C-alpha cells in the first residue's frame, strides 16, 4: 500500500496496528434494533495490546480485504446473514448472560465491602477469561473471516455481542486474532494482562439496566448506607419526652419561678399563660393560689390546694407507746422578790449563783439539772420574782411538771406570790409550798398556812392535796424532804417521753454574746437533739453548731428533760417559743417565713389607727398626744421582753411610749443612727455601746442610758414621761376687794377706789368682777396704787386704787375676787 493511500483520512482499512474507533462511547451498554425485536448484548471494552504476530497477520490480510471489497452485493448479503446468526445466538445466551451478570454484581458488592476492588477484579477477569476465552476467540474468527470477504458500506452498523473486544463502526476487533493463512500459521500469543482499572460501583448497574433507568437503579455506597443506618439509630435513641402531668400542691401564695418548677414547665410558658389572664409578672414575683390554679389547670396539671399553715404539719409527731421511757421531772421555782428562790437552788445544786446577781434579784431565767445521791435527776427552772417578769413566770409554769412556790416566813404572801399561784393553777400543775427562812427568829409558820387558805392552797395536814414544807435554804434545813416530795409527785405523775426520733422542746432563754453569736437555752421535751441537727424555733432557724450543758461542758446530744445551750441559729428566738428538728433547711426556712408573715399581719392589725386630724396636728407640731421614742437593748430576750411589757403598761393618755426597736446584744451604730433619725433615747440593760457606737452617739448627740436593775430603768423612764406631760394649772384664791368710789382720770381712765375686805391682792394677779353675784368680767389687775404710789400688794383692811386691763365698766358696789394661777408638775 502506498503512502498516498495511507494518508487518506476517510478511508477505513484494517491495516492499522490497533483497531480503534474514530468516535468514542461513554457508556458500555448499547442497543441494536432488529426486524421486530430488541436485543441487549454486553460489550466489554478493554484496552488490549497485541503482539507483533497479530500485527503481521493483519498486514497480510490487508490485501485480501481490499480485494474482497469489490466482490459485490453477494459478499454483503453473506456478511449480513452471519451477523443475524450472531444476534440469534446472543438471544439464546441471554439467560446465561443474566446469571453471569448477577455473579458480577455480587462480586462488585464484595469488592466494595472489602475495599480491595482491584484484586477481586483481576481474579474474576482471569477466571472468566479461562472459561470463555477459547469460544469467544473462535466466534470472533468466524465473524472476521466473513467480514473480510464482505464489501464494506458506509452505513453505521452497531453490534452488541457477548464477545470481548473493541467495538468499531464496522465491526469488532478481537483481542486475540488467528492468522488465516495456512501456509504461514502463526499462533496468537496470550493477550497481555495489564492491571485492570478500578471498577466504578455504578458499572454493573449501567450494564444491567436501560439508559432511562440507570439513575433509579443505582446502588448506594456502603458508607451512605452506614450513614443512613446511624441516622435511623440516632432517631430511635433520641425520643421526644412525653409531657408529664403532675399534681401540684398550691399554697396561698407562690412565686412564679417556684410554680413553674413544681409543674416542670418553662417559666416563659407560665408567664405567657399569666399574660393571657391579664397579669404581668416575672419569675421573682408571687401570685395567689386562684391564679395559679387557673394556669395549672390550663396546662393540664392537677391542683391540690393547701393552707399556708400546713407547712407546720411536718412538726406534728406521735410517739409510740413502746418507745416511751421515764424522764426526770422539770421543776419551776417561783415566788416573790428576795424570798430565797435562787438561794434554794444554790443549796440544791451546791453552787453560788445568787452572789453574781445585781440587787439580789434574778435578771433572767436559768435552767439547772441536779443529780441526787441515788442517781435520780431533777431539772430546775429559776424564774424572776419581779412583777415585770410575769411573762417569764407564765412560761415557766407552762413547761414544768411541778411548781415550787417559795414564801418567806418573815414576809408572808406578796403580790408576786399570788401571781405565781394563779400561773400554776392555770397550767394545772402540782404545787409544793416551801416556807423559807425558818431559821430566822420570831416567825409564824401557821400564819403563812392560814394566808394560803385564802388562795385555795390547803396543806395535807388540813386535808388538802398541797405539800407545805418548812425549809431553810441558808442552813440547808429540810432540803431532803423537799427532794423526796418532788420525786414522789413525779412518780405519781408517771412522767415519760420518747428519746427516739426528732427532738422538740421549748426555748427557755436566748441572748447574743460577743464572739459566739446567738445563744439559746432550750429544754428538750421529746426525742434526742444532736449536734448538726437543723432546728426551727419561732422565726429563727439554723444548724446546731455547738451544745453545752448547764455546767458549761460541751455535749453531742441531749435527751428529754435535759437543759442545754446551743449556738447556730440565725437570730435569737423569743423565750417560750417551741423548737423542732426538721429534715432540710428549706423546710425550716419555709416555716420561718410563714411565721414572720403571720406576726407582721398581726402587728398591723393591732396597730392603732390615726385619724386625719391627728395627722394634721402632728404635722403642725400642735398634737395633743406626745411621744417618747425608745430603743431597748438587753443581754437576754426575757429581760428585754419584761422591760418592754412594763413600759407599755405605763399610763399613756398624754404621752405615748413608742418602742422603735428592741433586741438582744450590745448597742451598735445602727441603733444610734435610728435614734438620731427619730430623736429617740437608747436604753441599755446589762449591755454597753461599742467604741464606734459611742463616737457616733457623741457626734449625733444621742442620749444613751445604762441600767443593771429593772427598778431603776422603769423609774427613770416614768420620770422622763412625766416631764413631757403638760403641767397642771390650778387657780388659788388670795383675796376679795369691794369697790366704793369711781374716779375718772383723763390719761389713765377709770380708777376704782376699793377696800380689801379679805386676804391680799397682788399686782398682775387674776381678777373676777362680780355684780349681783354674777361674773361679768375676768381678767388681770393692771394697776395697784396706794396714795398715788404704785405698790405690789395690799393686805386686808387697807384702801387702794385698782384698774383692770382693757375693761372700764366698773360700778360702785361691785365685788372683785383676786386669784393667782399655780402650775403643778403632773405625775404618771
Swiss-Prot record:
Matching InterPro entries: EF-G-like_DII, EFTu-like_2, IF2_II, IF2_N, P-loop_NTPase, Small_GTP-bd, T_Tr_GTP-bd_dom, TF_IF2_bacterial-like
GO molecular function: GTP binding; GTPase activity; guanosine tetraphosphate binding; translation initiation factor activity
Localisation per UniProt entry: Cytoplasm
Stretches the record annotates as Disordered: 48-76, 112-148
Compositional bias annotation for Acidic residues: 116-126
Gene3D superfamilies: P-loop containing nucleotide triphosphate hydrolases (3.40.50.300), Translation factors (2.40.30.10), Translation initiation factor IF- 2, domain 3 (3.40.50.10050)
Bias kind Low complexity: ranges: 65-74
Biased composition (Basic and acidic residues): 127-144
Ranges for region G4: 436-439
UniProt biased composition (Polar residues): 49-58
Keyword terms: Cytoplasm, GTP-binding, Initiation factor, Nucleotide-binding, Protein biosynthesis
PROSITE patterns the UniProt entry points to: G_TR_2, IF2
Entry's family note: Belongs to the TRAFAC class translation factor GTPase superfamily. Classic translation factor GTPase family. IF-2 subfamily.
Name the UniProt record assigns to this protein: Translation initiation factor IF-2
Source species of the chain: Rickettsia bellii (strain OSU 85-389)
Source species taxonomy: Bacteria, Pseudomonadati, Pseudomonadota, Alphaproteobacteria, Rickettsiales
Amino acid at each position: 500500500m502506498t503512502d498516498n493511500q495511507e494518508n487518506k483520512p476517510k478511508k477505513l482499512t484494517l491495516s492499522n496496528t490497533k483497531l480503534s474507533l474514530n468516535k468514542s462511547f461513554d457508556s458500555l451498554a448499547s442497543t441494536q434494533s432488529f426486524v421486530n425485536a430488541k436485543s441487549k448484548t454486553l460489550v466489554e471494552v478493554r484496552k488490549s495490546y497485541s503482539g507483533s504476530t497479530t500485527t503481521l497477520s493483519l498486514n497480510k490480510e490487508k490485501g485480501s480485504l481490499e480485494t474482497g471489497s469489490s466482490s459485490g452485493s453477494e459478499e454483503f448479503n453473506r456478511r449480513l446473514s452471519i451477523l443475524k446468526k450472531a444476534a440469534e445466538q446472543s438471544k439464546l445466551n441471554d439467560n446465561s448472560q443474566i446469571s453471569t451478570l448477577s455473579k458480577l454484581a455480587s462480586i462488585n458488592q464484595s469488592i466494595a465491602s472489602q475495599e480491595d476492588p482491584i484484586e477481586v477484579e483481576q481474579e474474576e477477569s482471569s477466571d472468566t477469561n479461562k472459561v470463555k476465552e477459547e469460544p469467544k476467540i473462535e466466534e470472533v474468527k468466524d465473524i472476521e473471516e466473513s467480514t473480510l470477504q464482505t464489501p464494506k458500506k458506509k452505513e453505521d452498523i452497531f453490534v452488541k455481542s457477548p464477545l470481548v473486544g473493541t467495538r468499531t463502526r464496522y465491526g469488532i476487533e478481537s483481542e486475540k486474532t488467528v492468522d488465516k493463512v495456512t501456509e504461514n500459521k502463526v499462533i496468537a500469543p496470550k493477550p497481555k494482562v495489564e492491571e485492570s482499572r478500578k471498577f466504578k460501583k455504578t458499572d454493573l448497574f449501567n450494564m444491567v439496566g436501560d439508559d432511562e433507568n440507570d439513575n433509579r437503579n443505582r446502588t448506594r455506597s456502603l458508607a451512605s448506607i452506614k450513614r443512613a443506618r446511624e441516622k435511623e439509630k440516632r432517631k430511635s435513641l433520641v425520643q421526644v419526652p412525653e409531657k408529664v402531668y403532675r399534681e401540684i400542691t398550691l399554697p396561698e401564695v407562690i412565686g412564679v419561678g417556684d410554680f413553674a418548677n413544681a409543674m416542670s414547665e418553662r417559666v416563659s410558658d407560665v408567664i405567657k399563660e399569666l399574660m393571657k389572664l391579664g397579669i404581668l409578672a416575672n419569675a421573682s414575683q408571687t401570685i395567689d393560689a386562684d391564679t395559679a390554679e387557673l394556669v395549672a389547670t390550663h396546662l393540664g396539671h392537677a391542683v391540690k390546694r393547701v393552707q399556708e399553715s400546713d407547712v407546720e404539719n411536718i412538726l406534728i409527731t406521735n410517739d409510740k407507746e413502746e418507745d416511751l421511757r421515764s424522764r426526770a421531772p422539770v421543776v419551776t421555782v417561783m415566788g416573790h422578790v428576795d424570798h430565797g428562790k435562787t438561794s434554794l437552788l444554790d443549796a440544791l445544786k451546791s453552787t453560788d449563783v445568787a452572789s453574781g446577781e445585781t440587787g439580789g434579784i434574778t435578771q433572767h431565767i436559768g435552767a439547772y439539772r441536779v443529780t441526787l445521791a441515788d442517781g435520780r435527776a431533777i431539772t430546775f427552772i429559776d424564774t424572776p420574782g419581779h412583777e415585770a417578769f410575769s411573762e417569764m413566770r407564765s412560761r415557766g409554769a407552762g413547761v414544768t411538771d411541778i411548781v415550787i412556790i417559795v414564801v418567806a416566813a418573815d414576809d408572808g404572801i406578796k403580790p408576786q406570790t399570788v401571781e405565781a399561784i394563779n400561773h400554776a393553777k392555770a397550767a394545772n400543775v402540782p404545787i409544793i409550798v416551801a416556807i423559807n427562812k425558818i431559821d430566822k427568829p420570831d416567825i409564824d409558820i401557821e400564819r403563812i398556812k392560814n394566808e394560803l387558805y385564802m388562795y385555795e392552797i390547803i396543806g395535807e395536814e388540813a386535808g388538802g392535796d398541797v405539800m407545805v414544807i418548812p425549809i431553810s435554804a441558808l442552813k440547808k434545813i429540810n432540803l431532803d424532804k423537799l427532794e423526796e416530795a418532788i420525786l414522789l409527785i413525779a412518780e405519781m405523775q408517771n412522767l415519760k417521753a420518747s428519746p427516739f426520733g426528732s427532738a422538740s422542746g421549748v426555748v427557755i432563754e436566748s441572748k447574743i454574746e460577743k464572739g459566739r453569736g446567738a445563744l439559746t437555752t432550750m429544754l428538750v421535751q421529746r426525742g434526742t437533739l444532736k449536734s448538726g441537727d437543723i432546728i426551727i424555733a419561732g422565726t429563727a432557724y439554723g444548724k446546731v453548731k455547738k451544745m453545752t450543758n448547764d455546767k458549761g461542758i460541751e455535749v453531742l446530744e441531749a435527751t428529754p428533760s435535759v437543759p442545754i445551750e446551743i449556738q447556730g441559729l440565725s437570730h435569737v428566738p423569743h423565750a417560750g417559743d417551741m423548737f423542732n428538728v426538721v429534715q432540710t433547711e428549706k423546710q425550716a426556712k419555709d416555716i420561718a417565713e410563714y411565721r414572720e408573715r403571720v406576726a407582721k399581719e398581726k402587728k398591723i392589725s393591732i396597730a392603732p389607727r390615726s385619724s386625719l386630724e391627728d395627722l394634721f396636728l402632728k404635722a403642725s407640731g400642735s398634737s395633743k398626744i406626745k411621744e417618747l421614742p425608745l430603743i431597748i437593748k438587753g443581754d437576754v430576750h426575757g429581760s428585754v421582753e419584761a422591760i418592754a411589757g412594763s413600759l407599755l403598761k405605763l399610763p399613756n393618755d398624754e404621752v405615748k411610749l413608742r418602742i422603735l426597736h428592741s433586741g438582744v446584744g450590745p448597742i451598735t451604730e445602727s441603733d444610734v443612727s435610728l435614734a438620731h433619725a427619730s430623736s429617740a433615747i437608747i436604753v441599755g440593760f446589762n449591755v454597753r455601746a461599742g467604741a464606734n457606737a459611742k463616737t457616733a452617739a457623741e457626734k449625733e448627740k444621742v442620749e444613751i442610758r445604762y441600767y443593771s436593775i429593772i427598778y431603776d430603768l422603769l423609774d427613770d423612764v416614768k420620770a422622763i414621761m412625766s416631764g413631757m406631760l403638760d403641767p397642771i394649772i390650778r387657780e388659788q384664791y388670795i383675796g376679795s376687794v369691794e369697790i366704793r368710789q369711781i374716779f375718772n382720770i383723763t390719761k389713765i381712765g377709770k380708777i376704782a377706789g376699793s377696800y380689801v375686805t379679805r386676804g391680799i391682792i397682788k399686782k398682775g394677779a387674776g381678777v373676777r368682777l362680780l355684780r349681783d353675784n354674777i361674773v361679768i368680767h375676768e381678767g388681770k389687775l393692771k394697776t395697784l396704787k396706794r396714795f398715788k404710789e404704785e405698790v405690789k400688794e395690799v393686805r386686808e383692811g387697807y384702801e387702794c386704787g385698782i384698774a383692770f386691763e382693757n375693761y372700764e365698766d366698773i360700778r360702785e358696789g361691785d365685788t372683785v375676787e383676786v386669784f393667782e394661777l399655780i402650775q403643778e408638775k403632773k405625775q404618771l
